[in-house]
């Protein structure tokens, strides 16, 4: 799903989208859909969910494009933020139950950083697909997007302790898979 970059400037793309020009909206979509699809796949359990997240996200982009402020961020960064929030909303809808698990700092396992560094991003994302939805979302938000546990808790409507627990579970899962791979 790779498309050539648009010949229009970023400003012209934004202006066209604000004017609801379908041709320009299609150009914006084609320019960014591949990289944003990768982002959606990192949150989705399957391809269909990722496509739904992407489509919902682009709908929000086009509906909110007039609120984009070029002096604050690039259009890609702004759209990426919308996609992340759309993915979280999607996960929330699918995971209506609000589980709260309290986790104390002293129970945080020592993470074998070297083991995780040996894995490619693609290997990690493939392995993450087997994790529960919330655990995968916490891992992505913390490791990939750089959110802290307080921010993750607010986004996912879970406690900071629950966020820490999900991150710990994701890391333990990845390390165990890596150890099993080394033994094979």
Where are the model-predicted features located?
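Structural recognition of an alpha-helix C-terminal capping motif at a helix-to-coil junction
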Residues: 52-59, 73-85
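A short pre-motif secondary-structure segment
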Residues: 138-142
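Arg/Lys-rich amphipathic alpha helix in sigma70-family domain 2
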Residues: 67, 81-101
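C-terminal edge and immediately downstream basic/flexible tail or linker adjoining helix-turn-helix-like DNA-binding
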Residues: 1-7, 16, 126, 154-157, ...
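Amphipathic, Lys/Arg- and hydrophobic-enriched alpha-helical face
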Residues: 29-47, 64, 80, 128, ...
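A short, charge-rich alpha-helical start-of-domain segment used by transcription regulators
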Residues: 14-38
């Amino acid at each position: 799903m790779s498309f050539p970059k648009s010949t229009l400037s970023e400003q012209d793309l934004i202006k066209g989208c604000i004017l609801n020009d379908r041709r320009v909206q299609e150009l914006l979509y084609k320019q960014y859909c591949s990289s944003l699809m990768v982002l959606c796949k990192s949150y989705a359990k399957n391809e269909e969910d990722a496509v739904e997240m992407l489509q919902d996200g682009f709908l929000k982009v086009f509906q909110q494009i007039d609120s984009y402020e070029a002096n604050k961020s690039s259009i890609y960064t702004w759209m990426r933020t919308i996609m992340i929030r759309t993915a979280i909303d999607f996960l929330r809808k699918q995971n209506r139950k609000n589980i709260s698990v309290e986790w104390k700092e002293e129970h945080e396992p020592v993470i074998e950083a070297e083991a995780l560094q040996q894995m490619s991003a693609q290997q990690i994302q493939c392995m993450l697909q087997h994790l529960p939805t919330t655990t995968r979302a916490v891992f992505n938000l913390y490791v990939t997007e750089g959110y802290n546990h307080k921010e993750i808790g607010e986004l996912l409507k879970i406690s900071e302790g629950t966020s820490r627990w999900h991150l710990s579970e994701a890391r333990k899962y990845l390390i165990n898979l890596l150890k099993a791979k080394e033994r094979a």
